[in-house]
């Protein structure tokens, strides 16, 4: 009986080209499998980065929060960051652009992924930060830090038209979504908000990031938000989860399953190629040995 294992070993030694072909097949398979793994990791990272860019990295939001509740919330044991936002008014321009005037603290900017091109948050009453799209829409495209601009906005509380001169303290990068929707931002100082508003009647949107670093589900985050709302005396109808951000933290099963399927195809194809190389080589040798036996060669020969 012919020992096919020995024949295979001898065949590998005698036929370097076949051995090299097998090695190349294994190397290519390994490279392709590694590429799939890298693609899956990069796809997940890109999805997360893109979501944070457009949806922020806060886990939830509490709306209609008064100043006293906001103070309690900022010191809550379950909360790491609270971004405060108070809408003041909006300027509507003839080209259908809208410029939202609002107070936002540093954490609110951070949690909503605002990026400074230059400058800093306003501290004085007459200072303001605008995104580059707002400056362009207002006709102040070439204005820079320290220069004066005028804004005429409709006050949300009394619907009065208010004109105010501000000094630019910072310029924000305009997102693609803001550019497409012609919806821009102007950030006022806390002192301007307090000196022009009746704070006892004002409410805030509070963007929240929890201390808990584990990947919480949407349901778990909603429960935590509702608990916090109850703790500060806020109706739970005012809580909402940033579902886009939470979903981006989870592995994309569609991408993973696609990668696993392609990986299995590569592995099976590689096995088939290597098997065929061995099989064809062994069959050829068996045929050669059969011819030798037919003409009278002994086993030893």
PLM feature segments, named:
Residues 8-16:
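Short, Lys/Arg-rich N-terminal segment immediately upstream of the first membrane anchor
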Residues 1-6:
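Short, membrane-interfacial amphipathic segments enriched in basic
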Residues 220-226, 230, 242-259, 264-267:
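Extended helical coiled-coil dimerization/tether regions that scaffold
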Residues 41-243:
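Basic-flanked hydrophobic alpha-helices used for secretion and membrane insertion
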Residues 16-44, 250-291, 300:
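Hydrophobic alpha-helical transmembrane segments of multi-pass inner-membrane transport and secretion
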Residues 13, 75, 83-86, 278, ...:
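Protein kinase-like catalytic domain
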């Amino acid at each position: 009986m012919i020992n096919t294992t020995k024949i295979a070993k001898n065949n590998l030694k005698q036929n370097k080209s076949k051995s090299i072909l097998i090695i190349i097949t294994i190397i290519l398979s390994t490279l392709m499998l590694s590429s799939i793994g890298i693609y899956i990791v990069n796809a997940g990272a890109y999805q997360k980065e893109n979501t944070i860019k457009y949806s922020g990295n806060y886990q939830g939001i509490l709306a209609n929060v008064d100043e006293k509740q906001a103070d309690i919330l900022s010191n809550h044991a379950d909360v790491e960051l609270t971004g405060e936002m108070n809408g003041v008014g909006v300027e509507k321009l003839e080209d259908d652009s809208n410029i939202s005037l609002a107070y936002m603290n540093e954490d609110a900017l951070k949690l909503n992924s605002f990026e400074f091109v230059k400058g800093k948050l306003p501290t004085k009453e007459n200072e303001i930060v605008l995104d580059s799209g707002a400056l362009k829409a207002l006709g102040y495209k070439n204005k820079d830090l320290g220069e004066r601009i005028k804004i005429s906005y409709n006050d949300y509380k009394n619907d009065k038209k208010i004109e105010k001169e501000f000094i630019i303290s910072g310029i924000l990068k305009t997102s693609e979504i803001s550019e497409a929707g012609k919806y821009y931002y102007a950030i006022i100082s806390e002192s301007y908000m307090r000196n022009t508003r009746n704070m006892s009647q004002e409410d805030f949107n509070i963007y929240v990031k929890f201390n808990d670093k584990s990947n919480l589900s949407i349901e778990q985050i909603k429960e935590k938000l509702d608990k916090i709302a109850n703790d500060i005396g806020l109706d739970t109808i005012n809580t909402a989860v940033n579902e886009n951000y939470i979903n981006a933290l989870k592995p994309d099963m569609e991408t993973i399953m696609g990668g696993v399927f392609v990986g299995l195809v590569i592995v099976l194809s590689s096995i088939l190629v290597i098997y065929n190389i061995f099989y064809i080589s062994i069959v050829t040798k068996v045929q050669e040995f059969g011819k030798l036996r037919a003409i009278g060669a002994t086993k030893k020969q």
